[in-house]
């Protein structure tokens, strides 16, 4: 355990940020899983809505620095390709 006051603060901040990042990454995974489930079922209208939702979450997380912007773009592209296969 840290002894210096500033080191203690850094530990607290790191724990908060880690929890925040983990929460957002879980949102991303959940949105992608929901989209893929709908795509598997073949429901085009619902898949389009889930694609928009997943894209929104990816963009927000990239803006917040949770994931890199190129990773967000790559994921969105992959999801769009999946959607285009059923559309």
Curated annotation (Swiss-Prot):
Coiled coil: none annotated. InterPro entries: Ribosomal_bS20, Ribosomal_bS20_sf. GO terms for molecular function: small ribosomal subunit rRNA binding; structural constituent of ribosome. Transmembrane segments: none annotated. Gene3D superfamilies: Ribosomal protein S20. It comes from the Bacteria. Disulfide bonds: none annotated. GO terms for cellular component: cytosol; small ribosomal subunit. Keywords: Ribonucleoprotein, Ribosomal protein, RNA-binding, rRNA-binding. GO terms for biological process: translation. Belongs to the bacterial ribosomal protein bS20 family. Binds directly to 16S ribosomal RNA. This is Small ribosomal subunit protein bS20. It comes from Halothermothrix orenii (strain H 168 / OCM 544 / DSM 9562).
